[in-house]
UniProtKB/Swiss-Prot annotation:
Subunit architecture: Monomer.
Family: Belongs to the PTH family.
CDD domains, per database record: PTH
Site feature location: Stabilizes the basic form of H active site to accept a proton: 91
UniProt keyword list: Cytoplasm, Hydrolase, RNA-binding, tRNA-binding
Species in which this protein is naturally found: Bacillus velezensis (strain DSM 23117 / BGSC 10A6 / LMG 26770 / FZB42)
Compartmental location: Cytoplasm
The protein, known as: Peptidyl-tRNA hydrolase
GO-annotated molecular function: peptidyl-tRNA hydrolase activity; tRNA binding
Annotated gene: pth
Reaction equation(s) it catalyzes: an N-acyl-L-alpha-aminoacyl-tRNA + H2O = an N-acyl-L-amino acid + a tRNA + H(+)
Length: 188
């Protein structure tokens, strides 16, 4: 089984904000793979299907970003999945807007959603797809920036990054993640 989780904040207020780019990617995967997100349990919205012969679970935690681990740990337990079955998609301030970077493990890097996951999973060893949202300019506070909407100029870059994320997730169904990581990171 493959569990793909996109991190974000629930509710209309946060739709299409920089911090919710993980949710955007899950929505796109849901459309591409025809997996309806129709279950609400474990503080999450999720759906299950089969893609390329593999059982896939797409998840959007409905906890706030900083509590994402409270949703994903119980889902992994319920479906008898492990951290090695998990791929997490989330925003990254340290990457330029629209760039993606894949990693197999690492620290939280200041991202509270990832910090929560590491705490609840008991390990930093899970696959990640980071989508760059850039850094705030002109003295804007980070919290205001990540909870703000993408500008008209940023939107096409984010749409492209979400498309690349879908392709990376598709590739990881048939190839080892390390191989997918090397392929996609080389083209960043």
């Amino acid at each position: 089984m493959l569990v793909i989780a996109g991190l974000g904040n629930p509710g209309k207020t946060y739709e299409n904000t920089r911090h919710n780019v993980g949710f955007m990617a899950i929505d796109e995967l849901s459309k591409e793979w025809n997996i309806e997100l129709n279950k609400t349990k474990f503080n999450g919205l999720y759906g299950m299907g089969f893609v390329s012969g593999k059982k896939v679970l797409l998840v959007k935690p409905l906890t706030y970003m900083n509590l994402s681990g409270e949703c994903l740990r119980p889902i992994l337990d319920y479906y008898d999945a492990d951290h090695e079955d998990l791929k997490v998609i989330y925003d990254d301030l340290d990457l330029p807007t629209g760039k993606i970077r894949l990693r197999t493990k690492g620290s939280a890097g200041g991202h509270n959603g990832i910090k929560s996951l590491i705490q609840h999973l008991g390990t930093p060893e899970f696959d990640r797809v980071r989508i760059g949202i850039g850094r705030p300019v002109n003295g804007m506070k980070v919290v205001d920036y990540v909870l703000g909407a993408f500008t008209k100029e940023e939107a096409p870059h984010i749409n492209d990054a979400v498309s690349k994320t879908v392709k990376a997730c598709e590739a990881s169904l048939t190839k080892p993640f390390l191989e997918v990581m090397n392929e996609f990171n080389a083209n960043v």
